[in-house]
A protein has these predicted regions:
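Acidic, Ser/Pro/Thr-rich low-complexity regulatory regions
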Residues: 1-114
Length: 114
């Protein structure tokens, strides 16, 4: 039987990442495994899990967990708002700065080439 992903479970993982109790590689591996093994009809969960599965190549770091927590904390009735929040978020991230900062990092480094 497929396990259903729940918002509160994901929020607790995101909080652990945000507080650096989990590192980026750990939450990334968790997301890949959970996405393979679990199901959800929740569009916000899907959007957050897609972001988490792309941590290395999209250069998401622990500070980004907060916007995902905010999106998942909105009521399900406000899913459109949450999706817009997540979709617009990359536009405010300084990716060039992250590439410079993370180019020696074992997880992110391979994705930091120009």
């Amino acid at each position: 039987m497929m396990v259903i992903l729940q918002r509160d479970e994901i929020i607790s993982k995101l909080q652990a990442w945000h507080q650096q109790a989990l590192d980026s590689e750990e939450i990334w591996r968790w997301a890949l495994q959970s996405t393979a093994e679990c199901v959800t009809e929740d569009v916000v969960i899907r959007a957050v899990m897609e972001m988490l599965c792309a941590i290395p190549q999209d250069l998401w770091v622990e500070e980004d967990a907060q916007v995902m927590i905010d999106a998942l904390s909105n009521p399900v009735a406000q899913s459109d708002l949450s999706i817009n929040l997540l979709w617009n978020y990359p536009d405010i991230v300084d990716l060039a700065g992250r590439r410079r900062t993370l180019h020696d990092h074992p997880l992110y480094g391979p994705y930091c080439g120009e």
